[in-house]
Swiss-Prot record:
Subcellular location: Plastid, Chloroplast
Subunit and partners: Part of the 30S ribosomal subunit.
One Gene Ontology term from the biological process aspect of the record: translation
Gene3D superfamilies cross-referenced by the UniProt entry: Ribosomal protein S7 domain
Function: One of the primary rRNA binding proteins, it binds directly to 16S rRNA where it nucleates assembly of the head domain of the 30S subunit.
Organism: Typha angustifolia
GO cellular component term, pick one: small ribosomal subunit
Protein name as it appears in the record: Small ribosomal subunit protein uS7c
Amino acid sequence: MSRRGTAEEKTAKSDPIYRNRLVNMLVNRIMKHGKKSLAYQIIYRAVKKIQQKTETNPLSVLRQAIRGVTPDIAVKARRVGGSTHQVPIEIGSTQGKALAIRWLLGASRKRPGRNMAFKLSSELVDAAKGSGDAIRKKEETHRMAEANRAFAHFR
């Protein structure tokens, strides 16, 4: 038994302007080399672009996009008897959101375009509509889990 106390789970802080935890999670994932102010600039510009494109509440578009990309199930490599199986596992809400944000940012970075704010806004709008690379990644993950359903008992 461990002599150390268990670590308390940290709660995600909210950003200063929108008071939203999802925005803060997005800022922390988009940040590179500790440049948080630049990450905030990119996010806020992307939010303005979403406002201009859709003429709706940009935070609802963000929520809808993340909800659409969040996976319910994923596969995890598990070594059993000398061979590695892809075992489907259920994903919790926090981990699912983190994966969704990672996929959205990855898809945004791959997009052709002028700047990151433009690419991110386009990807978020597409994801909210149900298309885009991030949605495709989620569907691919679900297909993999479905194909490897026979190994679900290896959990």
